[in-house]
Swiss-Prot record:
PROSITE patterns: SH3. The modification Phosphoserine is found at residues 1258, 1261, 1266, 1379. One of its GO terms (cellular component) is cell tip. Residues 278-296, 316-330, 576-586, 799-808, 886-902, 923-940, 1317-1327, 1351-1362 have a biased composition (Polar residues). Residues 472-494, 637-648, 1242-1278, 1340-1350 have a biased composition (Low complexity). GO terms for molecular function: myosin I binding. InterPro entries: Mti1_SH3, NCF2_NOXA1, SH3-like_dom_sf, SH3_domain. Residues 275-648, 662-741, 762-851, 886-1365 are annotated as: Disordered. Residues 1300-1312 have a biased composition (Basic residues). Residues 300-312, 421-433, 605-619 have a biased composition (Basic and acidic residues). The modification Phosphothreonine is found at residue 1380. Residues 361-373, 387-420 have a biased composition (Acidic residues). This is SH3 domain-containing protein C23A1.17.
């Protein structure tokens, strides 16, 4: 059951040449009456004239109407046709014989091409084929089925449509019961058995019918059979009888059946024309029980023969064909190849007409003898009496007259009968034979046992005889009654004898009896080589003597026997022995004396010999030496026959030697046949001429390639035997090659010239060996390739390098790794082996450092290759093991060391390498360099697939293999060896090294007894430019140079024992100076416990400004005197390169007086709070967090700031010195006033100071940081903030510098351990949470200070190839709070994009709003805002790009067309003749699409949906789906040029300047032409225009299918 609409609308015009088809134009509404099988409908409509039309039409030309109702109805054939069982009467008596069904068809129709297809489709559709039926008969009207096909549709169901005409007869037809369906007697006689097909009554006349034809088949006199009235019918007879011949070809199609029957009929008629009238009378007698008169039957049969000869009709193939004796009034006609093949298929002897093996009755044999005797005494017979045997070999005159006609018939029949597959093989073998010099056909005929002579006779569509049948069948020489004991020669020789040469003479058989004497295998010159005699033909004591051939070209080797009296040409096949007397006194019949010889093999290439006629004749030989012409396979080379030098000219030998040089057989006997067959099936055998190097002009010796692929060795005996068998070419010009083929090495390619190499015979690609490696000597490494040296290889290597170096003689080195690096190969270069290496050898010094022990090469070569073991200690040799560290370790573990197997304790463990320090870095580096060079050279020589890489040292996991440095370039120094020398300086731009296990020893600086002059800066340190007024100050580095002390100042003691007992009182600070709070982010620095040494300033460290800028005054508590500060005594403090310039203070510090009573610099007992760093925001600093030490009390003096790195710090005294009085001449330290530059206000544009990690105080440092300047300290606001814009590199440098300064402080400031311990403890506790607490505090303070929303905006990666680009998020508009609002940047895009808004909830207190912006190429930019509806200030904005969707499939396009296609077409046609909008093309298309719902609107007037068809100047054409009415078409600068109209007038048209749009109303597939509804091009009204895609010369034409939004995922 199938559903169909009740009403359809025509999309395309339909025209048909059939009168019962319904023709219509586009837009026609058709009422569907019924549906037909094969996508056809039957419908009706009323035309414009009021006439109702009805007919069938294809449904592909229509579409369902809008008001159509789909109904379900059975197919027309199922409704109107009877059941299959009413047309077949079957009996279940032949189950299992369905595979042997043979179809026979008789037809007089001229149109047989469509007959087979229609008949099979009809039978398969009705399921009429019943394998259980004994005979199946169907009638098919030929006139109906042979009607021409329509031109409009390829899927028209002709056979289904004409089903109504098939049942013109009311009753089915079956095979009559009186006559068996297939009998043995009918098979043995020609055209005497008639299958009488009976049936019911004619539907029109009511008379009984029988499906037979009187003009072709003799009918029976049965009363139940009547000749049918309708001759134009086809009879299908399927024979399933158990006695049917099973060797008939299985014809699959009706067309094959017709062709087969045509050929079989022609052969049967040809046989009947040559039969004797007695045979006709015999057949009439045999069929007398079926016909009233034998004479009338014979007359009717002769009439049918003449008609069959003229009309060449088809004949039922299951009637047997046989040859009858020749008539006395008509000379016999020789059998053709087709007739012979047909008779052989029916098991008939081709030389004995009317004979069937084992199936002829005694009556038939008597009739045969009578007919034979009549033929012998007939004056018209070609057979002469026994007394005149000399004239029997003359051909008849009738044969000469009909010779040309027979040849033409044979050629036509051969062309029709040759199977295509067999024809290909014939053509291939003929081509190979011609290439091989003309005689290779005898060799290439071996595969498949197809003889080269008369080979086309065996290529009929009849089964070939089996080997047992060929041995059991006999030749014509024996009497008919002894058929059971006779034997026949092979099929090849039978065919060869049946096609004689016109110049060959026929000679009678020898009268002497032949004795059963077995003979060995011999070769004869005039027969194909490799001849094997049949058993039972020669006696055991009858030798075959071979004489030396003479110099004459027309003579060959003559075989001699006991009787040498008579000579005969060609091969002699003796009769089967009955008795010697019978063979001596009996004269054979003339048919038995016509024994033809095959053409000889020509082995002489002399032009005179080829031109002579004698070269085509057989050489006489002795009659007593029987000879058999069966082709045998090449045997072993143990033949006694002496070969001649021309045997080497046999192309088969050359081909065999070339092929066996590549892939010789394992055994000589079996492999020879297989290789010959392979060579015969190979189409790449080259031609061989006298100019080819395969044949030398002197010795006729073929030169073969020397290929090292399993070449079989040849012993000296076999080579000597070959030399003995060679004969001078002048002794004989014609000889056969030896039966066995021997394969040996003759010459190599090195003995040939370069020009000769190009002419060498090609070899099939399948036998081509792999390319051989070249040795240094330039020859092919045959011995190496055949017998490779056994070695202990490391698993994973597949090939060995073939170089001339000493790598093969070196011990393989096994690499034992703890990681995943690949193992090295089994060869390693020695220090002296530099020959053939791509890279130079490493120096001996580096190589000796490897500590590798090599053993003697001979032990490696002589030892057999053991199986690969998991452990290398069981090897018989001293293997060298290299232990390398794991590349994935987090820290540097040292360099790999090489240890000998004999010293296992030297193996370094991976876990120990982490904690073990590097003792000698230079020695390790040297070993590492040598190892790297050695491994690199090994990897380069051994063709490692991957290189070795150095393990990672930065704490990350190593990725990939270790890179190898060239041997000539030393690898870079390890990180831990950079500061291995006390005097070595780190390289420029080198990352700081890891701390060493031992501190670097430096000389401490001596304390100053007086105020020293300002030290000069190094020449490498550039001066610091003066800072600007707006630049914020920077903090002073963690260390600073010592403050110079006047000469009268007592020296600072080096130990705590010299400290004063009590500190002097400190004056109270001024009220204007605020106290400096300790921020949570800056850890306090404890008081120094000692005097640090003056380190050497770094090269990259810039100079530090004067102490007047870098050292601010120490705020003193109330009552404490101010601390004197020298202005010029301190050396400059180096400032990092990345720090901003330090502002110059407005008030200069006064110089420090040098009286004798000047007190020393007071030393505070506790650490002073650190100075906060400037920030861009500078919020107020809160109270210190937990863990931060409080501000020191006023009774204690503040600490002395520590200078930067590279400047010695101020040596503080253990106790505070007394404050100088004005009477002493020391002015007090001035307090900064309002004249000091204020700290710049926080702003978003002010750059934040990024302090390098080297200038940040270390958590383990004992020196306190110093503020940047006195003005900054005094004018610092109450609240500040710290910027955290520091990169990873800066933090890494900070940590490295902190560790170094910590170790340095511990080493040089151990004299004040108490203060150091207390300060270190507080600092470490404060440093743990300083960063996190400061960040949290800054976040809270920032939110309190400014109520602006904190918006984080992220943008994903965007592909430049798409149109989608990032847009401005417009965060200040807060568009995400309004459901319908979009960013202003999206609104400004106007019609160039489409956008869609999505909203949702992602979690608790989290909402999102997404704006999908669609660009013309359908790529999208998705702008998403995630926010908290309760707290709108916290928002996250993100943008990402979406690629265009995939191209829609055909099924999706069909669905989209079903949604919008009909609606668009109907709306567009409604506008035809009127103006839409402003009259532009886009307005018309946009107005039509505006009525649709859920579709994608046009974007930027460029895209309208999915692309169906795209043509760019007829150069690039892309078609995805079928163009249909209702699709949108766009023209962009398109130019059409061509011819149109009935007069083929030229036209030129330009469309699309600017872009033009339209809606397709019609589409002609054959012309590639569209009709478009458009407006705005020629007029402002909607009109129809046509365009041909084939006339497009330039520009672009695109057809769009309107798509739904779901295609983009928009719901």
């Amino acid at each position: 059951m199938s559903s169909f609409p009740t009403r359809v609308v025509a999309l395309y015009p339909y025209r048909s040449s059939f009168s019962d088809d319904l023709e219509f134009d586009p837009g026609q509404v058709i009422d569907v009456v019924s549906n037909l099988d094969g996508d056809w409908y039957t419908g009706t409509y009323v035309d414009s004239d009021g006439n109702r039309k009805i007919g069938s039409f294809p449904k592909d030309f229509t579409e369902p109407a809008e008001d159509a109702v789909f109904v379900e109805r059975a197919s027309e054939m199922a409704l109107h046709q009877p059941t299959p069982t009413s047309a077949v009467h079957s009996r279940n008596s032949s189950l299992g014989y369905a595979p042997s069904i043979t179809r026979s068809i008789k037809s007089i129709s001229n149109n047989t091409e469509h007959l087979g297809a229609d008949t099979e489709s009809y039978l398969s559709a009705n399921d009429f084929i019943d394998s259980t039926s004994e005979a199946l008969t169907k009638i098919v009207d030929v006139d109906t089925l042979s009607a021409p096909f329509g031109n409009d549709s390829n899927s028209r169901p002709h056979s289904l449509k004409n089903v109504e005409k098939l049942h013109t007869f009311s009753a089915p037809y079956t095979i009559s019961e009186e006559t068996p369906s297939c009998s043995t007697e009918n098979d043995s006689l020609p055209l005497t058995a008639t299958h009488t097909i009976t049936g019911g009554e004619d539907a029109a006349t009511g008379a009984a019918v029988t499906n037979t034809t009187t003009t072709h088949i003799t009918t029976s006199t049965n009363t139940s059979t009547v000749i049918p009235s309708n001759p134009n019918s086809v009879f299908l007879v399927d024979c399933t009888h158990s006695q049917c011949p099973t060797d008939l070809p299985n014809i699959a199609t009706t067309q094959h059946s017709l062709r087969y029957l045509d050929n079989a009929s022609a052969s049967a008629i040809t046989v009947l024309e040559r039969t004797h009238p007695a045979a006709s009378s015999t057949m009439a007698t045999e069929s007398s029980h079926q016909s009233p008169s034998a004479d009338s039957q014979a007359e009717e049969l002769s009439k049918s023969q003449r008609v069959a000869k003229d009309d060449d009709p088809f004949v039922v193939s299951n009637t047997a064909n046989s040859d009858e004796p020749a008539s006395s009034s008509k000379p016999a006609k020789p059998l053709t190849d087709l007739n012979r093949a047909f008779s052989q298929r029916l098991n008939l002897d081709p030389q004995k007409p009317g004979k069937s093996q084992g199936e002829i009755s005694e009556q038939e044999e008597d009739e045969y003898d009578d007919a034979e005797s009549d033929e012998m005494h007939s004056p018209y017979s070609t057979h002469e009496p026994e007394s005149e045997p000399e004239d029997q070999d003359e051909p008849s005159e009738k044969d000469d007259e009909n010779k040309d006609v027979e040849e033409e018939q044979e050629q036509e029949q051969e062309e029709e009968q040759i199977d295509p597959e067999e024809a290909k093989r014939i053509a291939l073998r003929e081509r190979m034979a011609k290439m091989s010099g003309g005689i290779g056909m005898h060799v290439f005929g071996l595969p498949g046992l197809a003889a080269p002579i008369g080979r086309k006779n065996t290529l009929r569509r009849t089964p070939a005889k089996s080997s047992e049948e060929a041995k059991s069948t006999t030749n014509d020489s024996s009497p008919p009654k002894d058929s059971s004991s006779t034997s026949t020669q092979p099929t090849e020789q039978s065919n060869a004898q049946q096609a004689p040469s016109p110049k060959e003479e026929e000679r009678p058989l020898p009268s002497e009896p032949s004795q059963n004497q077995p003979a060995e295998y011999r070769d004869t010159p005039d027969t194909p080589r490799n001849i094997m005699p049949l058993p039972g033909l020669m006696s055991a004591d009858q030798p075959i003597k071979v004489t030396e051939p003479s110099n004459d070209a027309d003579k060959a080797i003559v075989a001699e026997g006991p009787n040498n009296e008579e000579e005969t040409k060609g091969p002699v096949i003796p009769e089967t022995q009955e008795t010697s007397e019978q063979q001596v006194h009996k004269t054979p019949s003339p048919e038995k004396q016509k024994v033809l010889s095959p053409p000889p093999i020509i082995t002489n290439f002399d032009k005179e010999t080829l031109a002579s006629n004698e070269a085509h004749e057989a050489v006489p030989q002795k009659p007593s030496a029987p000879q058999v012409t069966r082709l045998m396979a090449p045997q072993d080379s143990s033949s006694v026959v002496t070969p001649s030098p021309t045997s080497l000219l046999d192309p088969a030998r050359a081909v065999r030697k070339v092929i066996d040089g590549i892939d010789p057989p394992k055994e000589a006997g079996a492999g020879a046949t297989a290789d010959v067959e392979s060579a015969a099936n190979s189409p790449i055998t080259p031609p061989r001429t006298w100019h080819s190097p395969d044949f030398t002009s002197k010795s006729f010796e073929p030169i073969e390639r020397k290929l090292p692929s399993r070449i079989s060795e040849v012993t000296e005996d076999s080579i000597d035997e070959d030399k003995q068998n060679e004969v001078d070419p002048s002794t004989s010009a014609r000889a056969l090659p030896p039966p066995g083929l021997r394969f040996g090495k003759v010459d190599t390619l090195a003995s040939l010239a370069h020009d000769d190499l190009d002419d060498l015979p090609a070899v099939p690609r399948i036998f081509s060996p792999p390319p051989l490696p070249k040795t240094p000597s330039g020859e092919f490494g045959d011995n190496e390739f055949m017998f490779p040296k056994k070695s202990n290889r490391v698993r994973g290597h597949q090939s060995r390098p073939s170089t001339g170096s000493q790598l093969r003689n070196v011990v393989p080195v096994s690499i034992v790794t703890s990681g995943g690096r690949p193992a090295l190969p089994d060869e390693m270069a020695s220090p002296s082996s530099s020959i053939g290496h791509p890279l130079p050898s490493p120096p001996p010094a580096d190589f000796n450092s490897l500590n590798v022990d090599f053993y003697e090469p001979h032990s490696y070569l002589e030892s057999p290759a053991p199986e690969p073991q998991p452990s290398y200690e069981e090897e018989s040799f001293n293997a060298t093991v290299i232990h390398a560290p794991t590349p994935s370790t987090a820290t540097f573990q040292g360099h790999p060391t090489i240890s000998n197997v004999a010293t296992p304790p030297l193996k370094q463990d991976v876990t120990e390498s982490k904690a073990s320090p590097v003792a000698d870095a230079s020695a390790t580096h040297q070993s590492s360099t040598g190892l790297t060079q050695e491994i690199t050279q090994l990897g380069s020589n051994m063709r490692l697939p991957t290189k070795l890489t150095r393990p990672s040292n930065d704490g990350r996991k190593a990725s990939g293999p270790r890179p190898a440095a060239p041997p000539s370039i030393p690898p870079p120094l390890p990180v831990s060896n950079i500061l291995s020398s006390p005097t070595s300086e780190p390289p420029k731009d080198h990352p700081p090294s890891a701390p060493l296990s031992k501190p670097v020893s430096t000389s401490p600086a001596a304390p100053l007894a007086r105020v020293p002059p300002v030290p000069k800066l190094s020449s490498k340190a550039p001066p610091v430019p003066l800072p600007s007024a707006d630049a914020p100050p920077i903090p002073v580095p963690s260390t600073a140079p010592p403050v110079p002390i006047p000469t009268s100042t007592p020296p600072v003691p080096k130990s705590s024992s010299g400290a004063p007992s009590a500190p002097p009182p400190v004056p109270a600070p001024s009220s204007e100076i605020p106290s400096i709070p300790a921020p949570s982010g800056a850890p306090p620095v404890p008081a120094p416990s000692g005097i640090p040494p003056v380190p050497k300033p770094s090269v990259a460290a810039p100079p530090v400004p004067k102490p007047s800028v870098a050292v601010p005054p120490v705020p003193a508590p109330s009552g404490a005197p101010p601390v004197p500060k020298p202005s010029v005594a301190a050396p400059p403090v180096p400032v990092p390169s990345g720090a901003p310039p330090v502002p110059k203070p407005s008030v200069a510090a006064p110089p420090v007086p040098a009286p004798s009573g000047a007190p020393p610099v007071p030393k505070p007992s506790v650490a002073a709070p650190p100075v906060p760093a400037p920030s861009s925001g500078i919020p107020p600093v809160p109270k210190p967090a937990a863990g931060v030490p409080p501000v020191p009390p006023p009774s204690e003096a503040p600490p002395v700031p520590k200078p930067s790195v590279g400047v010695p710090p101020v040596p503080p005294p253990s106790t505070a010195p007394p404050v100088p009085t004005p009477s002493a001449g020391l002015p007090p330290v001035p307090v900064p006033t309002a004249k000091a530059p204020p700290v710049p206000a926080p702003s978003s544009e002010a750059p934040s100071v990024s302090t390098p990690r080297s200038s940040v105080p270390s958590p383990h440092s004992n020196a306190s940081p110093s503020p940047t300047s006195s003005s900054m300290a005094s004018a610092a606001p109450a609240r500040t903030s710290v910027s955290r814009s520091k990169s990873k590199a800066e933090r890494h440098e900070t940590s490295t510098s902190s560790r170094k300064s910590s170790k340095s402080g511990e080493h040089h400031h151990h004299h004040n351990e108490g203060h150091a311990d207390s300060s270190s403890t507080r600092t470490s506790l404060a440093h743990q949470d300083s960063r996190k607490s400061l960040h949290r505090h800054l976040s809270r303070s920032s939110s309190r200070a400014s109520k602006k929303p904190s918006i984080v905006s992220t943008t994903g990666p965007f592909n430049e190839s798409f149109s989608a680009k990032p847009v401005e998020p417009c965060a200040s508009e807060k568009w995400w709070l309004n459901s319908t609002a979009v960013p202003k940047s999206v609104v400004q895009m106007n019609d160039s994009v489409l956008y869609m808004i999505k909203e949702g909830i992602t979690g608790q207190d989290k909402k999102y709003k997404s704006v999908h912006i669609l660009f013309p190429d359908y790529s999208q930019t998705v702008l998403t805002a995630t926010f908290n509806p309760h707290n709108q200030n916290i928002t996250q904005l993100s943008q990402l790009q979406l690629a265009p969707p995939a191209q829609p499939s055909k099924a999706r396009l069909d669905e989209e067309y079903a949604c919008y296609g009909s609606t668009i077409l109907k709306k567009a046609r409604a506008y035809q003749g009127s103006m839409v909008g402003d009259g532009s093309a886009f307005t018309f298309v946009n107005s039509v699409m505006s009525i649709l719902a859920h579709n994608l609107e046009p974007i930027n007037k460029q895209t309208f949906g999915g692309v169906i068809y795209k043509n760019v100047g007829n150069v690039t054409v892309q078609q995805i789906g079928e163009i249909r009415p209702g699709d949108i078409v766009t023209f962009d600068k398109a130019k059409f040029s061509g011819q149109k109209g009935t007069l083929r007038s030229k036209y030129s048209l330009e469309v699309g300047k600017p872009m033009h749009y339209g809606i397709i109303s019609e589409w002609d597939v054959s012309k590639l032409k569209i009709r478009v509804l458009e407006q705005g091009r020629e007029s402002k009204k909607v009109s129809v225009a046509s365009y041909k895609f084939g006339d497009l010369k330039s520009g672009e034409v695109t057809v769009w299918r309107v798509m739904r939004r779901s295609w983009l995922g928009w719901n």
